[in-house]
A protein has these predicted regions:
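Conserved Rossmann-like nucleotide-binding pocket used by diverse enzymes
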Residues: 31, 90, 198
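Generic marker of residues within folded, mature protein domains
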Residues: 20-22, 79, 189, 219
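Polyanion-binding catalytic cores of nucleic-acid enzymes and NTP/SAM-utilizing transferases
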Residues: 1
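Conserved AdoMet/S-adenosylmethionine-binding subsite of the radical SAM
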Residues: 96-240
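Conserved Radical SAM active-site core
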Residues: 7, 38-133
């Protein structure tokens, strides 16, 4: 078995979370390069493949860079009384490097960080390897209308493992079908009707109609307790 000692890192930076339940939260971001999918609406398509812009780093090198960026911005966290700064582990798809993350994430926890995993929720076996280190899991449901195939089985298994650590995000485009929204809500309800669902309309391309968003929201709300319609704020303010 090959031991993974380095992963391709596209960027490490400080910003504010721009989407989902934690919109506005100051975070450090660790963006890994490489993904197991190619979704039509992807807003970080530059990180799908491992390009020359990605640097292969060890866990110690990543920790050092994260600590450096945190120290540069720690006054932001202090002013907001945030004792445990949050790191968003994102991509690409970070769980393709689950074996590496098993070594990195404990080091980040030991250094006082809380961990926020952003994932396409298609690799439940990989999630099992790191779930105990994750504080929050932002999982995207991927629809056949955009990705060309369904992942309902994987999404349900992913939710079973994540349980109360997760919320679900669905990107809505003009191609999204009502049945995909209903199916998403039913899959979530099969685990817990209290898991939050974020309906996130695309604002770049294939923009959905307002009436469709209203219909999708109303149908999901019939099934789940917590449904929200939210756009990506970082795109409005043109920040990362």
């Amino acid at each position: 078995m090959t031991v993974v000692t380095k992963v391709p890192v596209y960027e490490i930076f400080f910003s504010f979370q721009g989407e989902g339940l934690y919109t506005g939260l100051p975070q450090l971001f660790l963006r890994l390069a490489g993904c197991n999918l190619q979704c039509g609406y992807c807003d970080t398509s530059y990180s799908i493949i491992v390009s020359k812009k990605a640097k292969c780093l060890t866990s110690d090198e990543i920790l050092k860079k994260l600590c450096f960026i945190y120290n540069k911005n720690k006054n932001v966290f202090k002013r907001l009384d945030i004792d445990r700064p949050s790191i968003s582990i994102t991509g690409g798809e970070p769980l393709i490097y689950a074996d590496f993350l098993k070594g990195l994430l404990p080091k980040l926890k030991e250094n006082g960080f809380s961990l926020y995993l952003e994932t396409n929720a298609t690799l439940p076996k990989n999630l099992k390897k790191v779930i105990k280190f994750c504080d929050v899991i932002s999982m995207d449901f991927k629809f056949p209308s955009e990705c060309g195939k369904s992942f309902w089985k994987e999404h349900k298994e992913f939710l079973k493992i994540s349980k109360n650590k997760a919320f679900v995000k669905c990107v809505i485009t003009k191609n999204t079908k009502l049945q995909e929204i209903i199916k998403s809500a039913e899959v979530i309800k099969s685990i817990s009707k209290n898991i939050s669902l974020i309906l996130q309309p695309s604002i770049d391309k294939n923009i959905p109609a307002i009436q469709d968003l209203y219909t999708f929201y109303c149908q999901a709300k019939k099934i789940l307790s917590n449904v929200y319609l939210m756009i990506q704020m970082h795109k409005i303010y043109n920040i990362r």
